[in-house]
Amino acid sequence: MKFLNKIIHELLAQNTDLSAFNIILPGKRPIVFIRQILEENNYSGFLPNFFTVEELINKIADQQPIQGIPLWLFSFDVYRSLNLIPRDDFSDFLKWFPTLQKDWDDILKFSDSDQAVLQYMFDEERIKEWAQDLGEDDDVPRKKFLNFWQNMNVFLPVLKERLQEKNWATSGMIHEAAKAKIVDFAKNTKEQFVFCGFNAFTPVEEKLVRSLLQWNKAQCFFQADRYYFDDERQEAGKFLRNHKTWKEFDDNRAFQWIEDDFNQPKKIKVYEVSGNVTQTKVLPEIFKEINNKTYSNTAVVLLDENLLPASLDVMHGVDNLNITMGFPLKNLSFSNAVKRLFYLQKQLEKNKSSYYYRDVFPILEELPKSVEDEQIINDFKAKVEERNIVYISKKLLHELLGGLSYIGLLQKAASTNIYLDMLIEFCQQVKWLEIDDIQYENVSHFENAFRIIKNQLTPYNIEIKMETLEILINQYINSESIDFQGEPLRGLQIMGLLETRLLNFENVILLSVNEGKLPLGNSQNTYIPFDIRRFFDLHTFLENDSIYAYHFYRLIQDAQNVHLLYNALSSGVNTGEKSRFITQIEMESSHEIEHLIIENSSEPITTKPIEITKTQIVQDRLQKWKGKVSASHLTSYLYNPIDFYLSKILNTSETDEIEEELSVKNYGNLVHYSLQEVYEVLKGKVLKESDLKNSVKAIDQYINIAIEKLKHQPEFYEKGMNYIHKAIAKKVIENVLNHDLELIKQGNKLEIVDIERKFENIDFPLDGNDKISFMGYIDRIDKLNGTLRIIDYKTAKIKNLTVKIDQDNVDEYFHNSDRKQALQLCIYHYVVQHLPEFWGFPIETGIWSFADAKKGMVSLQFDKGNIDDAMKSVRSLILEILNPDINFVETIKTY
């Protein structure tokens, strides 16, 4: 830490007792390093006092800081007391006040008069609109903006006055209050101040430093470098060049220090990386180049805080790791769960009868849970998925989740106050669970926020709706972060850019060195236009760019090995453009820069099929399978041997998933089950016209029974596409019944023999004495004019029911998935031939497709060959399945 070492040696040369000094720093991060340096120098006296410049300004102002939720509530109370138009409620107020408050703080910090800026904004809008007739409608956008600044000229002065009455102050007001006291403070204080490593000052901070310098009660140590200090074009030196012109720096007091470190030899590598997270994958390769494997002089600087989790994933081999940066609260799972809880409450206000499953499931997954709660949640999800419940009734939710420790959070709250109490209690319970440190901090932040909101609401008598509370919490989540602090003296440092101030590292690795990240560019949320900010000396994005330029150059000026990574892919707000700071050092510096292009290391997805060897265990299972072979097993094998292996041999099943729209499979089941109910009543009868006409009238009743069989809720079919699917299913059933009715009207004799006829133990010989046994169900068996019809219902269209089999293709004929319908019908034909009760009847097999139900049954036809030839091909297929030398190989579909 070269710069800090230099300061300490300078101070020790002046006074061996450092307790005489107050050391003022931009942030608290360097304090621990200063203490280490003092220890290394065997300093045994009292330590100096350490302050950030904000703390010193606060001390001088002597006002109580107020920010965040307490400030928002107090400010709204003032705003509503003024009866301004429009009379925004608290939720509307929260949409504009946080941004305005930042602007107001900027005005108070940088301008001579906040009233002048506010009046200027109002006058500016009036001038823009003087020649336009805005009419009487207050909703015209420009008129609303004009009214806004008119209101702010009333509201903000009153807010300042009310805050001052309580000795409360925003950060801008603290600066304004300190400004009036600085001269007296500098004159009367007996203390000595040392300002270290500053770059940009607010006017009040500058006045404080210069006043103390004038009274010889301060000294300043700057960390400048000739590379950007002497070159007027370099924005990094903008503020430091201005400081050097202060009259306080003269022959008796030199401007300290301007080094020449940037131009010293150093290795700089620029990495063009394809992908944001891919940058983190490069880190292990960079670490290999670092000789000191303790990484004690290495910093990884994340310009995008969202890369922290991915960075930690690749650093598992680093023994000592120190994180010093803020991680946004909004990126943590508990934060997402809290946001979802408030969204759920808002939905419950709209829908008083049921819960949408997608509103509930993520909450249950993301909230920390006990072992008991986890079991309750798993059972709940299993039952909801099994029954395909999209909208869960309140009664059912309580029935299935009644034992959940936080069930109250999922129910409609009686009031926001009661709900806040429940949230506070829940946070307390969660902290007793086994959760990691980050989640513990996450929960603690929210517990504190809920307490603040509850305590602050009481004196203001503000009526808070759940929607308003949601906005308040979301504002809090988006503005807060968890600050990580570890052991900074050991190991690898992971930091944000601001945390690097005053610190120097031999090896520096910066990620996301993209335009828009470094510098941030024109991305400020502000109501004050650029030209007005410039006119009143408020900081614009140009000043912010200069500040970030200084941080960048200062960090790398003392480094020996610099690695700059940027994401070259354009996605969302990222343009894929490298930071102009990289371009500057490429074009303007004397350093040789090595450029590397890192493509995404992931290989393209290969289409290599899965292959399962038929081991002895698999063969044993196949032997067991031979006792229960169904036609659907063989069609499954034709479609994909791996699916057959998993579902029919290993007996695995797909996980139940909730269908918001009825799937093709369940649409088929709905029609199938309905027809089963219709014809079950007619089984054993020779049908009459009246039978079928009565059945047509009762279709709705049969469909409802089918819905129960599917374990679906009736509400599932009440709207949207599912309502249409049900209507189509009804039409299909009607078409089937009408087709049968038409047959009878034409004088045909139709008898329903059986429905869902189960068969098993129908032996089918293989080679030698080997055999398999067929089992399964036939959807419908009827007799039409004495001919036995074997009917299989299909949702799909009919395909390839004409068999052309001969000696040349007999073995391979049914090894084609396009012929699976004919294969199934041939097996049914064989089975029925071997059922004694059907001996002597002519047999016809066919498919009745729901896709064209009016057509009726389409029969299997043999252009070449016969059923015996067909069964030879079936035998060949079964032998292939059983053959130990033929592996199960995945069929990869190409579309």
Predicted segments, located by residue:
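Acidic-histidine catalytic/liganding microenvironments
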Residues: 97, 215, 835
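Basic/charged alpha-beta structural segments of nucleotide/phosphate-handling enzymes
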Residues: 28-188, 203, 378-385
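Conserved helicase NTPase motor core
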Residues: 128-239, 272-275, 506-507, 671, ...
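Coupling/hinge elements of helicase-like and P-loop NTPase modules
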Residues: 90-93, 235-266
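Anion-coordinating catalytic cores for phosphoryl-, nucleotidyl-, and glycosidic chemistry
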Residues: 1-52, 57, 61-64, 209-210, ...
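Low-complexity, compositionally biased segments
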Residues: 80, 91-142, 146-149, 228, ...
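Structured, non-catalytic alpha/beta "coupling" segments that mediate domain-domain communication
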Residues: 116-117, 217-221, 244, 636
